[in-house]
């Protein structure tokens, strides 16, 4: 559902495939409800068992369709347009945003920029050609449901996976129970619809269970599919480069995309800025299973906002509630919205300066960093393992020499 063939890159395929899925569900309904449920179980075994099959499968399918609709209607989450940072301390701030305490950048210290949206890119934001805007916490485009999965609809995607998986598990259980009796009843053959059901159920149980397990792993580490793909690219590229060492046999396979896993963060340090290097395996956005899980279900899949400012937000009671939202369908639709909406900063309504207002808006969407990562960055600064941004290059030499022995500010 994530790693799509090249065919899925075409716009027409993205429209046709969800329709094919719906038509496929229609056939599966015929095979389950009529061929298995009525012609076999209801007529030759038990009316009650047949009714239980119909009720359970109908409930699962209603959940699948409901969460599919929620996926599409809710959308992945649109990133706000952030004007360029005031890196050069310009007096004309009409089209600029104050520089935040930290932002992710390239090796030279410049923030990432989306040329299509004409905006600073927030962490883990990616521009979607299908939506024509940048997606918050972009995960992937799912061709099977026909929409982008991002920050806002990610939890509905997990619910969709659960109930789609349950649908096929229930189908396979009933099917395996009554296949032999269908075969033994005189014809020594089975209904050909059963063969199709076995193939489809086996295939989708394998795909959906693997995908659900992978995404639960992502939630535990507050990762995205893009993060995981980049980490795997690092391993492939490292393996390829080691195989192509001059002392070894050449690797004749296709050269993988270069990915070292090295990233950079631009941080306010004393009266200047510094660039610190880290790697993808440092997981700057992971706050541990308990917080990551509750941030997904109780804080709209965000690591910022008022919810994260209070330790009481991460109580055992709320952890239990978050599991309830995960396992019980539709509870999240009626759960009190005070923990689900984006909470605005109180100062936002009292600030007269549009310039300062832009920074507050940016901070509302900027991902927080975990303490372990901040300690790691601060330790690197203490050890002078940093360099100056290129836009401050005339001052770089003086700042580097004056920073020796000084204590870095905490972020």
Swiss-Prot record:
Q: Which cysteines are joined by disulfide bonds?
A: none
Q: Which GO terms describe its cellular component?
A: endoplasmic reticulum; Golgi apparatus; membrane
Catalysed reactions, semicolon-separated: L-cysteinyl-[protein] + hexadecanoyl-CoA = S-hexadecanoyl-L-cysteinyl-[protein] + CoA
InterPro entries in UniProt: Palmitoyltrfase_DHHC, PFA4/ZDH16/20/ERF2-like
User: What range(s) does the DHHC domain occupy?
Assistant: 112-162
What are its E.C. numbers? Answer: 2.3.1.225
Instruction: Give a Pfam family name.
Output: DHHC
What keywords is this UniProt entry annotated with? Acyltransferase, Lipoprotein, Membrane, Palmitate, Transferase, Transmembrane, Transmembrane helix
Q: Which family is this protein grouped under?
A: Belongs to the DHHC palmitoyltransferase family. PFA5 subfamily.
For this entry, the protein name equals: Palmitoyltransferase PFA5
* Organism from which the protein derives: Debaryomyces hansenii (strain ATCC 36239 / CBS 767 / BCRC 21394 / JCM 1990 / NBRC 0083 / IGC 2968) (Yeast)
Q: Which classification does the entry list for the species?
A: Eukaryota, Fungi, Dikarya, Ascomycota, Saccharomycotina
Originating gene = PFA5
């Amino acid at each position: 559902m994530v790693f799509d063939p090249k065919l899925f890159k075409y716009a027409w395929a993205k429209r046709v495939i969800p329709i094919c899925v719906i038509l496929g569900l229609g056939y599966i309904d015929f095979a389950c409800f009529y061929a298995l449920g009525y012609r076999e179980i209801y007529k030759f075994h038990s009316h009650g068992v047949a009714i239980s099959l119909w009720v359970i499968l109908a409930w699962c399918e209603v959940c699948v369709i409901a969460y599919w609709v929620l996926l599409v209607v809710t959308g992945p989450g649109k990133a706000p347009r952030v004007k360029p940072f005031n890196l050069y301390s310009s007096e004309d701030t009409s089209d600029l945003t104050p520089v935040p305490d930290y932002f992710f950048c390239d090796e030279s210290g410049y923030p990432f920029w989306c040329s299509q949206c004409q905006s600073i890119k927030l962490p883990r934001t990616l521009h979607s050609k299908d939506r024509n805007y940048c997606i918050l916490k972009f995960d992937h485009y799912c061709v099977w449901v026909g929409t982008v999965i991002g920050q806002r609809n990610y939890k509905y995607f997990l619910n969709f996976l659960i109930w789609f998986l349950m649908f096929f598990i229930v189908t396979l259980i009933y099917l395996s129970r009554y296949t032999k009796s269908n075969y033994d009843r005189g014809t020594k053959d089975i209904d050909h619809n059963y063969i199709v059901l076995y193939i489809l159920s086996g295939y989708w149980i394998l795909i959906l269970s693997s995908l659900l397990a992978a995404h639960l792993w992502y939630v535990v580490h507050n990762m995205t599919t893009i993060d995981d793909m980049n980490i795997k690219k690092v391993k492939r590229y490292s393996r390829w480069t080691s195989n192509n060492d001059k002392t070894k046999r050449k690797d004749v396979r296709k050269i993988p995309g270069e990915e070292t896993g090295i990233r950079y963060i631009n941080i306010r340090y004393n009266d200047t800025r510094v660039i610190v290097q880290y790697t993808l395996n440092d997981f700057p956005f992971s706050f541990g299973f308990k917080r990551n899980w509750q941030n997904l279900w109780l804080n709209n899949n965000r690591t910022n906002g008022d919810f994260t400012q209070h330790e009481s937000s991460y109580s055992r009671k709320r952890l239990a509630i978050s599991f309830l939202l995960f396992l019980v369908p539709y509870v999240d639709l009626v759960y009190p919205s005070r923990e689900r909406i984006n909470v605005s900063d109180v100062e936002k309504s009292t600030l007269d300066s549009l310039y300062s207002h832009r920074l507050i808006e940016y901070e509302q969407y900027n991902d927080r960093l975990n303490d372990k990562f901040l300690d790691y960055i601060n330790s690197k600064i203490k050890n002078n393992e940093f360099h100056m941004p290129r836009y401050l290059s005339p001052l770089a030499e003086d700042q580097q020499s004056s920073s020796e022995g000084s204590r870095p500010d905490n972020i």
